[in-house]
Amino acid sequence: MWFEEDFIELASLFYNKGLCDYIYLICGPDKSHIAKKIIDDSKKQYFIDCSNKDLQGVILAIKNSDFYIGNNSGPLNLSAALGIKTFGLIANDPVSELKYSNIKPITPEGYVDNIWIRDRMGMKKLKPNYVFNQIQKNLSS
């Protein structure tokens, strides 16, 4: 799972470039503390906490999005299935498991596929500016 401060920095890059007006934070109720931390730490009003939404509410939020960025999770796969441009932040999972999906994986430089590393620190290799540039390239193509 990517770190909250990295999501905050990435969101700031998109917002400051005028590429979004608001950002849905999609997670389950058990991860609501993460959405709250992002909102509290950022002190920004453009975040919308969706942790209390049911599946229909999550689908509505995703369908109202121009694109989706997230960890390798259920909502990431749901976004791709709904036909939304979907970018997966992958550093600790095999990206090859996404080969039949519409998810565009963003991996750190030097990434090695087919290795499971269950250490969250591996996600620190994905820097917000790098992720932003990768997504921006894909959005413009």
Predicted feature residues:
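Donor-binding and catalytic core of enzymes assembling or modifying cell-surface/extracellular glycoconjugates
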Residues: E4-A91
